Amino acid sequence: QFDPNISDSMKLQARFGIPHKKRRQLWLIASGGLKLLTQIGDVWPASKKSADTVMPSENSKFGSAIDILTFLPPAISRKVNKFLHVLWSQNQEIDFSPLIPTVAALLLLYMEVPLAYISIQSMINKSRQDSWYFTLTQDQFLASVHAFGELVEKKSQPVSHHAKSLNLNIAQIGLSLFPVFFLPFMPLPVALTLFDSFVIEGRKVLY
């Protein structure tokens, strides 16, 4: 029996990494996918059928600058590509959200396609209100990256000064790394632990 509420203990557990066998259940709860599933049922079959009438487009990558799919096994990559096309066909108003493909790929590592779909759709719905998980336009994304640069400047001046001494722009580094959850630049278990907290607490954990 699933408990649809996010407890403090769940948040704490996520910070240390959710056990593999619990990720499917906790991601479904924390993303709001379970609640949406109880409200509208399994919408994957209808969404997939509708997407079959929509021409494939590069837009289905949601503006992703670094293609995480190249780091996945070919079979998984094809699965994610098809999944993203269906998702984009139902959310064509999103013009730029490069984090979405990475989140989709990570959800599909642990979830069946219908559950991953209802989970990420719930995350998109919540983000329309307050960008909790995703920025949904290019302007929102660039503003969040700029805010990250200002935060580093304020909270970690040594890091900021070191970056400047190397002629590096912290905001541009964030622009490159955030959409892929630092993959493939950190071990997958570490990235998954970060993702655990992201699903529960939103994109603020990336800063």
Residue ranges and their predicted role:
Residues 1-207:
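Internal, helix-rich recognition cores of eukaryotic regulatory domains
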